[in-house]
A protein has these predicted regions:
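C-terminal segment of classical bacterial N-terminal signal peptides
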Residues: 3-11
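Transmembrane beta-barrel domains of Gram-negative outer membranes and organellar outer membranes
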Residues: 12-150, 155-159, 174-182, 186-249
Length: 249
């Protein structure tokens, strides 16, 4: 992360590959300690099961603080009636400590946006993948055949109607592969998704991903989520598409 903190003021930038100019703010479903710098913005879109689309915008208000909003729904792509999420998601992140040679960067944040379809049946009132809620994240970068970033965090989601309100934890790694590509792996322990009424099977969520910078601020991502089959009716994994554009004012 420290190697990514110093960057030139470019109109459009990327967080993927060894040529990355900014810090990645997310793994796959979970946040890192990475920040959008002041006067930078990120426009993201995620495409998932049941014709789902989620669009978000985040802005770096200061080097140490960012804010964003997101909204989406299911059946947006396809012939069925569109089902929008009950409310927009909001996120805010504050960098507590910058990375040093010995210590990781730390950030405190809030993110109410869950992933995948919103579930109202049986009074669950939650996303398929719960939102992070309140979280603290740590990130450390190492020079290893390019860049190797290690991330982890603790989070407490506000989605508790399924009866599972436990504190959760997650880990992740990012490895650059050449100047434009990063490979991601994320493990969500899902301690808050293994109650009797929850939909998790107690194995946690193992997610794999790829991020590819196409230049001029455009990043394309492909994810294979829930490889651990932590929910019913999953044969291989949940395939999703992710598109980001990052620029500066």
């Amino acid at each position: 992360m420290a190697a990514l903190c110093g960057f030139e003021s470019l109109v459009a930038q990327s967080y993927a590959g060894e040529g990355a100019k900014i810090e990645p703010t997310m793994l796959i479903d979970k946040p890192t300690a990475g920040m959008l710098k002041r006067a930078h913005y990120a426009i993201s879109s995620n495409y998932f099961q049941r014709g789902g689309v989620l669009v978000g915008v985040s802005v770096g208000l200061f080097d140490q603080f960012s804010f964003g909003i997101s909204y989406g729904g299911t059946e947006i792509i396809g012939p069925n009636k569109i089902q929008m999420n009950p409310q927009p998601g909001i996120n805010a992140k504050l960098r507590l400590f910058d990375e040093t040679l010995m210590m990781p960067a730390f950030a405190l944040g809030f993110d109410s946006q869950g992933k995948e379809p919103f579930l109202e049946a049986d009074s669950l009132n939650r996303y398929t993948i719960k939102s992070p809620g309140v979280y603290v994240a740590a990130s450390k970068n190492y020079a290893f055949m390019g860049n190797l970033s290690v991330h982890g965090g603790l989070n407490l989601s506000l989605e508790k109607d399924d009866g599972d309100n436990d504190m959760n934890a997650y880990l992740g790694v990012e490895k650059t592969l050449g100047p434009d590509i990063s490979l991601l792996a994320e493990y969500d322990f899902a301690f808050n998704d293994n109650h009797l009424r929850a939909i998790g099977e107690g194995r946690g969520y193992l997610n794999l991903g790829l991020r590819w910078s196409w230049g001029k601020g455009l990043i394309i991502g492909f994810d294979l989520k829930n490889v651990s089959k932590n929910q019913k009716n999953v044969s291989v994994g949940n395939r999703t598409l992710h598109i980001d554009y990052i620029g500066a004012f």
